[in-house]
Amino acid sequence: MANIIPILTDTQISEIEPKSEQKVYKALYKQLPNDWLVIHSLEFMKKTSQYNSHGDREADFVIFAPEYGVLVIEVKGGGVECNGQTRQWYSIDRDQNKHEIKNPLGQAKDAKYEIRNHLEQRGKRNILLAHGALFPDISNINA
């Protein structure tokens, strides 16, 4: 089992919202090696270019894997669709209605660069970082 922050009781795990993150929390905790560190819901401030302001952001999961690097994961639950031509992402609700959402890969990518900047400011350079998205409620892919 991986080291995970925060460590939650079964009751607390069952209260994680959205439920898609609950599934991923359980899977990462149980299936990753015990020398790996998983941080769930890592909050950070992102410096924006407009007026040098800051905005709060969150990475759903950040995995620190010794000898491999750092992986930042964005989780999207329920139905998810991406229009290949416009590259617009949608969530699909129970009534099959589409709702525009942010690009989950873009969200993970932004978080990755913020984490990289944070590490570099502390002298931690040359660390391999990657990003990705998980869709735990998707059972098939229609191309």
Question: What is the predicted role of each segment?
Answer:
Residues 1-143:
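Intrinsically disordered, low-complexity Ser/Thr/Pro/Gly-rich regulatory segments
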